[in-house]
């Protein structure tokens, strides 16, 4: 049975995106009419109501022991066969194909960076949370720091946070909230979802990938930062140095999706070799 993760915002709903770019992408990913807009808004209303400091801490404890399943990375990729991410309603195919499409796009543009190819394959594996009963608003969608006031480029920022209890707490309702200026994103509590889960899982299992890879995984859905230009007050110099890598990854994450599905069988040996190199064996999930 396929699990629909529910709608993610497209470019046309992100307030920081160039209108011409949004228009061209909107012709392919239609979020401009029908019931989908209401569903997208509902997803973000739930997310922005319930993603609090307390919620994120509880989820980190719940999943932080990585005791749900023992399996290899390729087995996790295969699990994505059962995930159809409705963020792309015009192209109805499993998320596993998106993993290979992203990886192959990176491979063509950066043939000398095999670790980067692997990040393309890995980046959405955290969506297996949906198979463990997590609601869509706690799995997909744009991410943001909890514990401080949401910034202007957070999608639906002005209309979805009214019922979030943290914004009534003076510790969390200012621009910096519970953080120190330029504390570094490594010290920031991000909203819970597939990015944060996989980032923590990679650390737990000691993936031997460069730090750029960990940044790409953890922050590829952090659109208010890498595209909106917000949350710079929390960034360290290292974060700013890593930002171009996250932006480079984002191009392939967004723009490699198409109905021409890759021949996965022929690609598997190459990517299995990368898995064996950087994250081999049976891992804890």
From Swiss-Prot:
Assigned EC number? 1.13.99.1
Ordered alphabetically, the record's keywords are:
Cytoplasm, Iron, Metal-binding, Oxidoreductase, Phosphoprotein
Cofactors that this protein relies on: Fe cation
GO terms for biological process, alphabetical: inositol catabolic process
State a single Pfam family of this protein.
MIOX
Q: Which reaction is recorded as catalysed by this protein?
A: myo-inositol + O2 = D-glucuronate + H2O + H(+)
Origin: domain of life = Eukaryota
Binding, Fe cation 2: 124, 194, 220
Its annotated compartments are:
Cytoplasm
Q: Where does substrate bind?
A: 29, 85-87, 127, 141-142, 220-221
> Cofactor note from UniProt?
Binds 2 iron ions per subunit.
Q: Which family does it belong to?
A: Belongs to the myo-inositol oxygenase family.
Descriptive protein name: Inositol oxygenase
Which source organism?
A: Rattus norvegicus
| Gene, per the UniProt record | Miox
């Amino acid at each position: 049975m396929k699990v629909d993760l529910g709608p993610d915002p497209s470019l046309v709903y992100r307030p920081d995106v160039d209108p011409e770019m949004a228009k061209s992408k909107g012709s392919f990913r239609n979020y401009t009419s029908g019931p989908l807009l209401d569903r997208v808004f509902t997803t973000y209303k739930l997310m922005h109501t319930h993603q609090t400091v307390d919620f994120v801490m509880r989820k980190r404890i719940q999943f932080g022991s990585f005791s749900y399943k023992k399996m290899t990375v390729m087995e996790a990729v295969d699990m994505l066969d059962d995930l159809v991410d409705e963020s792309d309603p015009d192209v109805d195919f499993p998320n596993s194909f998106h993993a290979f499409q992203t990886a192959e796009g990176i491979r063509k543009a950066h043939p000398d960076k095999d670790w980067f190819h692997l990040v393309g394959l890995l980046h959405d594996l955290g969506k297996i949370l949906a198979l463990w009963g997590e609601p869509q608003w706690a799995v997909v969608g744009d991410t943001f720091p909890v514990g401080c006031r949401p910034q202007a480029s957070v999608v639906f920022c002005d209309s979805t946070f009214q019922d979030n209890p943290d914004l009534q707490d003076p510790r969390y309702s200012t621009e910096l909230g519970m953080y120190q200026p330029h504390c570094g994103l490594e010290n920031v509590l991000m909203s819970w979802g597939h990015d944060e889960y996989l980032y923590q899982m990679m650390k737990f299992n000691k993936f031997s990938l460069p730090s750029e890879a960990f940044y790409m995984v953890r922050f590829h859905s952090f659109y208010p930062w890498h595209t909106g230009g917000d949350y710079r007050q929390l960034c360290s110099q290292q974060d700013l140095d890593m930002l171009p890598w996250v932006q480079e990854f984002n191009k392939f994450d967004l723009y490699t999706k198409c109905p021409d599905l890759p021949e996965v069988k022929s690609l598997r040996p190459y990517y299995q070799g990368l898995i064996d190199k950087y994250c081999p064996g049976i891992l804890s999930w």
